[in-house]
Amino acid sequence: MTSLPFPLSPEPDEASREAGRLLFAGPCDFVKGVTTMEALPPADRIEVCFAGRSNVGKSSLINALTGRKALARASNTPGRTQEINYFALGPSRYLVDLPGYGYAEAPKPIVQRWQRLLKGYLAGRQTLRRAFVLIDTRHGVKSVDEEILTLLDRSAVTFQVVMTKADKVSQAEREAVLDQVRGALKKHPAAYPELVMTSSEKGMGIETLRTIVATLG
């Protein structure tokens, strides 16, 4: 039987699920928002980052993971949220919220500044264990997503695709988008070979993603 490329991550076992629950049940506090490499906090713990197109549901996912309704705040103004936001998850982890990309309305200087910061962060952050790239299940991988995936390849940063808003499409539509995403990921050597299907609204996949973050060492 031929194995499916980029299968969905399996449901965690009880012990792994508990490790994820305990990690995210602890304190999670906003540390700082940075716009320059010099302002990054000390690289003294493991960190994971979340990247995605604007309106992909990144803030909702971070809030669902941490069980806090307003920890990460979305901006409805194009180009406004151009900081790397750091959250301390207990004493051992940073959750890093990267600025949403893909705003056509954002002024060019802001976009260029963000691109420089992102490239510097991905290339120079030795404690970064994984990037979670969020893809809207309604739309699949877009050309603007390809840009960030290629940048992650070049930076040799392992990334894992997290499908968002899975409750907004039918099962048939979901399978079609998964096929498209799997085809796109075959071209990217830095892609972790499992996908996570989520819905922040319904809680789908949240335990699985918590477990993944907890097991990264």
Curated annotation (Swiss-Prot):
MF-aspect GO terms: GTP binding; metal ion binding
Annotated Gene Ontology cellular component terms: cytosol
PROSITE patterns noted in UniProt: G_ENGB
Required co-factors: Mg(2+)
Top-level taxon in the UniProt lineage: Bacteria
Residues that coordinate or bind Mg(2+): 59, 81
UniProt keyword GTP-binding present: yes
InterPro entries for the chain: G_ENGB_dom (IPR030393), GTP-bd (IPR006073), GTP-bd_ribosome_bio_YsxC (IPR019987), P-loop_NTPase (IPR027417)
Keywords from the named record: Cell cycle, Cell division, GTP-binding, Magnesium, Metal-binding, Nucleotide-binding, Septation
Pfam family, one: MMR_HSR1
Residues bound to GTP: 52-59, 79-83, 97-100, 164-167, 198-200
Gene Ontology annotations of biological process type: division septum assembly
Chain ranges of the EngB-type G domain: 44-217
Transmembrane segments: none
Function: Necessary for normal cell division and for the maintenance of normal septation.
Family according to the record: Belongs to the TRAFAC class TrmE-Era-EngA-EngB-Septin-like GTPase superfamily. EngB GTPase family.
Protein's UniProt name: Probable GTP-binding protein EngB
Gene it is expressed from: engB
